[in-house]
Regions:
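Acidic/histidine-rich catalytic cores of soluble enzymes
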Residues: 122
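A charged helix-plus-loop insertion that forms the helical arch/lid used to bind
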Residues: 85-96
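ATP-binding/phosphotransfer module of carbohydrate and carboxylate kinases, centering on a glycine-rich
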Residues: 1-71, 82-84, 102-110, 127-134, ...
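A short acidic/small-residue loop/turn micro-motif
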Residues: 36-39, 95, 163-166
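A cytosolic small-molecule/anion-sensing beta-strand core signal
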Residues: 70, 76, 152-153
Length: 330
């Protein structure tokens, strides 16, 4: 097929890191995935101009090696208007109504297709991953934030405004910790990476984890330190991860019970670093499912790729350019 000669560039802008790479139409990464930190200004706002500058050399080089590039796909960790490429609300980057799609298109002279990272991830899993033959499933990401997206009756479920799926922003405690979205007590403030780090710091402050105290070496405890301690069987870290798994299971069970889903796919930085979390969520969620059929049939998998959102950003280019013929509502 003529479409086989095309490539796309995927760019995944997360809460702390940017990943990018070149893909063929079958989902194969060409060369390596490049990862750089998100540049922030003094006000802790992600600097969109520096982001564009940082990926420009890669894109220009890719044009030389892959002359038929169908476009650039952007996956971004928050609400994105996929029609005009505007990042409407990105709490972890402190963006509101940033026209990043247009800015990247103008700078790099290629078609640009932008969307939320969880939507991109679900596209990758449906086209190239474990959900190829599934019609009712959910993507869940655990990283700097917590979120998800839905695939219902063979279609992406975008919702009325295109923002469906922010499971991390259901309110669990209206007097709880402040969230980047402007609310307090959002679910992600209990289970995402910063919450795991906060729980680890509390354990160290209380003298409950000499291992995490040693690993952090006098600095603030990070999510990475908690997961390191978990893998060293530290009781405090084991308890933190167990509690996170239980809370995620409770949250997702409500979605599964409501929509009668067949599958959950979990990804994100925390899952990549601690894949055991998937098994623990699988263990707990059975207790909260309503029917015996759901308890029997629900499957929970770790994401198929090292970064499904990145793969999905590239896939979205092929879908929206009509180079892949798969009517999933992209």
């Amino acid at each position: 097929m003529a479409s086989n000669i095309y490539h796309s560039i995927g760019v995944d802008i997360g809460g702390t890191k940017i990943a990018f790479g070149v893909f063929d139409i079958h989902g194969n990464i060409k060369d390596d995935i490049h990862i750089i930190p998100v540049p922030f200004d003094k006000k802790k706002v992600a600097d969109v101009h520096r982001i564009i500058d940082s990926i420009t050399p890669f894109v220009e080089n890719a044009k030389k090696y892959y002359p038929l590039i169908a476009g650039i796909g952007l996956s971004i960790c928050g609400n994105v208007n996929k029609e005009n490429g505007e990042a409407t609300l990105i709490p972890n980057l402190h963006w509101r109504y940033v026209p990043i799609g247009t800015m990247v298109k103008d700078a790099l002279k290629l078609p640009v297709f932008a969307g939320t990272d969880v939507r991109a991830a679900i596209i990758a899993e449906r086209l190239w991953g474990v959900a190829k033959n599934s019609r009712f499933f959910l993507w869940c990401t655990v990283g700097t934030g917590f979120g998800g997206y839905l695939f219902l009756d063979g279609k992406l479920y975008d919702g009325y405004h295109g923002f469906a799926g922010p499971f991390g922003h259901t309110i669990w405690d209206e007097d709880g910790f402040p969230c980047g979205c402007g609310q307090r007590g959002c679910f992600e403030t209990f289970v995402a990476g910063p919450a795991i780090a906060r729980a680890g710091q509390a354990a160290v402050d209380a003298g409950h984890s000499p291992i995490m105290a040693t690993l952090s070496n006098g600095e603030r405890v990070t999510t990475h330190v908690v997961i390191q301690a978990f893998h060293q069987k530290d009781p405090a870290a084991l308890s933190i991860i167990e509690q996170v798994a239980r809370l995620i299971a409770i949250n997702l069970s409500g979605v599964v019970n409501t929509l009668d889903l067949e599958m959950i796919i979990m990804g994100g930085g925390v899952i990549q670093a601690c894949p055991e979390l998937v098994e623990r969520v699988d263990h707990y969620i059975r207790k909260f499912l309503m029917s015996e059929e759901l308890k029997r049939d629900l499957k929970i998998y770790k994401e198929s790729f090292i970064n499904s959102a990145l793969y999905g950003a590239a896939a979205d280019v092929f879908l929206r350019s009509a180079l892949i013929n798969d009517d999933i509502g992209a």
